[in-house]
Amino acid sequence: MKDSIKAKLQSLIERHEEVSALLGEANVISDQNKFRDLSKEYSHLEPIVMAFKEYTQALEDKEAAYEMLNEKDAELVEMAKEELKSANESIERLEDELQILLLPRDPNDDANIFLEIRAGTGGDEASIFSGDLFKMYSKYAEQRGWKIEVVSASEGEHGGYKEIISRIYGDGVYSQLKFESGAHRVQRVPATESQGRIHTSACTVAVMPEADEVEGIDINPADIKVDTFRASGAGGQHVNKTDSAIRITHIPTGVVVECQDQRSQHKNRAAAMSMLKSKLLQAEIDKQQKEQSDTRKNLVGSGDRSERIRTYNYPQGRVTDHRINLTLYKLDEVMEGSLDSIIQPLILEHQADLLATMSDE
């Protein structure tokens, strides 16, 4: 292991001890924001510290095994060889693990998200598929213990959605779903197809981290135009009685957001402003990623909505992620929310990409 990495790890261990002490102080416990931020930092440092302690122990075991090789007892020498082999394997594994743990963290990884699914080419079938995608992400969120709420929805004429925007909140939502942005293509025989022909449709998915005050996304009130209108669609007795739905236009960028799912105009406005901040934050992230991709190839993390990232082929029961050439014949399970078999390989590919960049530098 490089001396620079060891020095970095030593400084993180010292910081871990410092944060641990701070979390026990009365003035920190009484300040919810400070306590929350320090708790997050502690939980991030904990696995690094544990892995480094294990690594240090493996180095000590290796040294002890080397000394035992000089013993005259053949049985002890054989035991030393086994311990040396085990220690070397542990050292190799932990060096790889520590490299991953030391990768620069995406500052938005802990963020909640806005998930936007929009029907593309394919007419009614695209709308139906956008509904299927929403169910897939809803079931995945449920499995992870996250909460999901609809912010805005425009229903398709024969089911599904022309567009649906939801908010998903919980632990590490953005870190798991950030690579879902892009064009999702479906190949299947629609229920209305009498000839049994396979149709191809597409939906676009956008995953945006929910921007809060710490992101520094400040919106000048003079830069927005707020319109009210009557909510449409499902909603029972409250629908069309009052102009509670809100549309906000950000004049400098032309970004438009709507919210009509909440019962009051005040709540809809707050939700729409939060969504607008997230869209502006995502635009900034997209800009940074484009600048990075100009200097290096990043297959996984481009987040370009027009890029076809995945195909769902129903006749073959196949799902293919084109960015990492991953094909799984378990489409039914995936559509029921079993997404980890796709998401985890994407995360590993992204980590490998970051490691390659660090070694190039």
UniProtKB/Swiss-Prot annotation:
One of its GO terms (molecular function) is translation release factor activity, codon specific. It comes from Francisella philomiragia subsp. philomiragia (strain ATCC 25017 / CCUG 19701 / FSC 153 / O#319-036). Residues 287-297 have a biased composition (Basic and acidic residues). This is Peptide chain release factor 1. Methylated by PrmC. Methylation increases the termination efficiency of RF1. Signal peptide: none annotated. GO terms for cellular component: cytoplasm. It holds the Pfam family PCRF. It is found in: Cytoplasm. The keyword DNA damage does not apply. The modification N5-methylglutamine is found at residue 237. Keywords: Cytoplasm, Methylation, Protein biosynthesis. It comes from the Bacteria. Peptide chain release factor 1 directs the termination of translation in response to the peptide chain termination codons UAG and UAA. Belongs to the prokaryotic/mitochondrial release factor family. The keyword Cytoplasm applies. The lineage of its organism: Bacteria, Pseudomonadati, Pseudomonadota, Gammaproteobacteria, Thiotrichales. Residues 287-307 are annotated as: Disordered.
